[in-house]
């Protein structure tokens, strides 16, 4: 079995780690950073950029730069959360109703594909570090992700060429990293406020057992919302002073978003900062500049409602766990937003104690995922992890009522069976709608899918007995099977969700990802050979200027022609021309050896001349010198 990695696929940033002996190590990416921005961009030349390179060009390519797509994963376009996303790129309803994204040239991508590109990038970083292929991974998700979102994340792993060993909840992963070396039993709360989601989990830890007692959260609350609050404030202030609304200017919006995020981060350590964006727009009177001072107090007033929203899930989680805030031994802060002083203050106020800040909030989830990978592979022993399902799973019954079969905060994996029957005489089929959520009416909860039990022998209503079994696996993903108790016939049923990727779509995306990886490799080779060509042309032209008169006119003409041919072929932006450029590079390299010989010959002559000159100079400098016999000098004293 190969090495397995742990990946935190975040809304804003992602991170990869691996177990080395008894410790987990965060792996640096190609740029040498320990976290990678969860951003994918497509340039006008068709190049795909991931991470920091994608982030750097976002201002000039906002419509083709996809960030925060974790907020779209596993969601229907009609979901209320899809309104007012505040992103410059196009989000649309795919054929299955899911929210997908589209580039300006019409290429369509599912959020799972965008996630797969990021996972692929992290996989490559791990392979470069380990020097071997990586196939297995544990990937984290917000604890409050529903079945569709978990399945879509697992699909992303498959598209990236990974065998997903386990989908693990982010707070649980953080608890693993925090408590692996702690022997004494105590109860902790993991407060995880990240870039796009908020989770809170209550766990009991002791003697290698990590038991989640309750979890709650909000999958649409995080740093992105804090950024948007600052963006809206800056837009309002600019409109007040200049009378210009920048909302429809993608380039200005991208600059303001980046400045808002930067200001938010700075105000975690400073009391005041200045947002200064020269030439943010232009009108008939000339260019306009944005220059606004932002204090920590103002920022806190802008985001206070968002911080207060995190307390509601905290109350629910404690209530479900049957505990009070005073019974919590430690509160562990996870996620970049927990660096904000106001967030720390609010957590302290609610739980009545200073939160634990001894873990790196950006890396602890990936470290926990790596530990879970180690547990699965047998590298980490004597650790038992007992997680829970965050949402109730059930069906729609008469009158549209939601009837839960598996309650929220049930330890997983778990299984529950219930007997159903027919509502009419001689009914030969029953349609069962599977929902997930906490609302009383089925329509208010997430429809995971529906299936029909067919071929039921005709009988009076209420007589047939169909036992339907729901089970949730260790990934938190639901499965359904059905059995006709009269005939003993059993049928495994795959929930056909109204959304989600089909097996054919996943396979197509896997192929596309592999093809894209090959294309990326070709593009890399193309860029390298073009750089080699530019360097060779420059050095050859320089050598021709200095030593062109030292070689024969025929050789000089051949080299000049080869330089011009290489210049011409290097103008191409077609990556398929890499071999042609390479041939011209090889040809010029061989021809320019004549120049090298001339340079070497002249160098030898110069060295010979210098040697002769040095000898003559030394002979000219020989002079007779007076000397004193020191012994005689002593005697004469």
Curated annotation (Swiss-Prot):
Gene3D superfamilies: 1.20.1270.10, 3.30.420.40, Actin, Chain A, domain 4, Substrate Binding Domain Of DNAk, Chain A, domain 1
Summary of the function given for this chain in its UniProt record: Acts as a chaperone.
Record keywords, A-Z: ATP-binding, Chaperone, Nucleotide-binding, Phosphoprotein, Stress response
Feature: compositional bias, Basic and acidic residues: 618-637
Molecular functions (GO terms): ATP binding; ATP-dependent protein folding chaperone; unfolded protein binding
Induction of its expression: By stress conditions e.g. heat shock.
Annotated region (Disordered), positions in chain: 596-637
CDD domains, sorted: ASKHA_NBD_HSP70_DnaK-like
Gene name of this polypeptide: dnaK
NCBIfam families, per database record: PRK00290.1, PRK05183.1, prok_dnaK
Family note: Belongs to the heat shock protein 70 family.
Name of the protein in question: Chaperone protein DnaK
Bias kind Low complexity: ranges: 602-616
Organism: Wolbachia pipientis subsp. Culex pipiens (strain wPip)
Cell inner membrane in keyword set: no
Domain of life: Bacteria
InterPro entries: ATPase_NBD, Chaperone_DnaK, Heat_shock_70_CS, HSP70_C_sf, HSP70_peptide-bd_sf, Hsp_70_fam
């Amino acid at each position: 079995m190969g090495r397995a990695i742990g990946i935190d696929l975040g809304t804003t940033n992602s991170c990869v780690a691996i177990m080395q002996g008894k410790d987990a190590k965060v792996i640096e990416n190609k740029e040498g950073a320990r976290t990678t921005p969860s951003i994918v961009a497509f340039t006008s030349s068709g190049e795909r950029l991931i991470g920091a390179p994608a982030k750097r060009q976002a201002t000039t390519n906002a419509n083709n730069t996809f960030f925060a797509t974790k907020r779209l994963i596993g969601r229907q376009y009609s979901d209320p959360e899809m309104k007012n996303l505040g992103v410059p790129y196009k989000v649309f309803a795919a054929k299955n109703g899911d929210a997908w994204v589209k580039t300006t040239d019409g290429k369509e991508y599912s959020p799972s594909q965008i996630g797969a590109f990021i996972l692929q990038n992290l996989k490559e970083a791990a392979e470069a570090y380990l020097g071997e292929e990586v196939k297995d991974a544990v990937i984290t998700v917000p604890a409050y992700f529903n079945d569709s979102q978990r399945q879509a994340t697992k699909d992303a792993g498959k598209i990236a060429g990974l065998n997903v060993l386990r989908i693990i909840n982010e707070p649980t992963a953080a608890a693993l990293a925090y408590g692996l070396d702690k022997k004494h039993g105590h109860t902790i709360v993991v407060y995880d406020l990240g870039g796009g989601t908020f989770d809170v989990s209550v766990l009991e830890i002791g003697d290698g057992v990590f038991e989640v007692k309750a979890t709650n959260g909000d999958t649409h609350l995080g740093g992105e919302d804090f950024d948007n609050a600052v963006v809206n404030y800056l837009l309002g202030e600019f409109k007040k002073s200049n009378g210009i609304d920048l909302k429809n200017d993608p380039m200005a919006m991208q600059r303001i978003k980046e400045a808002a995020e930067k200001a938010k981060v700075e105000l975690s350590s400073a009391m005041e900062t200045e947002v200064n964006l020269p030439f943010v727009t232009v009108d008939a009177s000339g260019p306009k500049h944005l220059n606004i001072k932002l204090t920590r107090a103002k920022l806190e007033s802008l985001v206070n409602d968002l911080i207060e929203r995190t307390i509601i899930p905290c109350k629910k989680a404690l209530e479900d766990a049957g505990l009070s805030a005073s019974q919590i031994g430690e509160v562990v802060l996870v996620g970049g937003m927990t660096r904000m002083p106001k967030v720390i203050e609010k957590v302290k106020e609610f739980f009545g104690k200073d939160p634990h800040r001894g873990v790196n909030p950006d890396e602890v989830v990936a470290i926990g995922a790596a530990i879970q990978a180690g547990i699965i592979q047998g590298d980490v022993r004597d650790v038992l992890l007992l997680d829970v399902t965050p949402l109730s799973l059930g069906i729609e019954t008469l009158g549209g009522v939601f009837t839960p079969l598996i309650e929220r905060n049930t330890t997983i994996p778990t299984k529950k069976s219930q007997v159903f029957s027919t509502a009419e005489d001689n009914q030969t089929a029953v349609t069962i709608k599977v929902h997930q959520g906490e609302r009383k009416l089925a329509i208010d909860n997430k429809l995971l899918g529906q299936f029909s039990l067919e071929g039921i022998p005709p009988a009076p209503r209420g007589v047939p007995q169909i036992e339907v079994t729901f089970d949730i696996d260790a990934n938190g993903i639901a499965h359904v099977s059905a059995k006709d108790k009269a005939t003993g016939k059993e049928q495994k049923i795959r929930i056909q969700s109204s959304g989600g990727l089909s097996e054919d779509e996943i396979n197509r995306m896997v192929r596309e990802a592999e093809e894209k990886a090959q294309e990326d490799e070709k593009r890399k080779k193309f860029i390298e050979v073009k750089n080699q060509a530019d360097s060779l042309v420059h050095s050859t032209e320089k050598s021709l200027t200095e030593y062109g008169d030292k070689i024969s006119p025929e050789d000089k003409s051949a080299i000049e022609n080869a330089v011009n041919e290489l210049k011409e072929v290097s103008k191409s932006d077609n990556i398929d021309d890499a071999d042609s450029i390479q041939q011209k590079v090889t040809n010029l390299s061989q021809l320019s050896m004549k120049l090298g010989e001339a340079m070497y010959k002249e160098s030898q002559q110069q060295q010979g001349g210098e040697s002769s000159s040095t000898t003559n100079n030394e002979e000219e400098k020989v002079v007779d010198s007076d000397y004193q016999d020191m012994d005689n000098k002593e005697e004469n004293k």
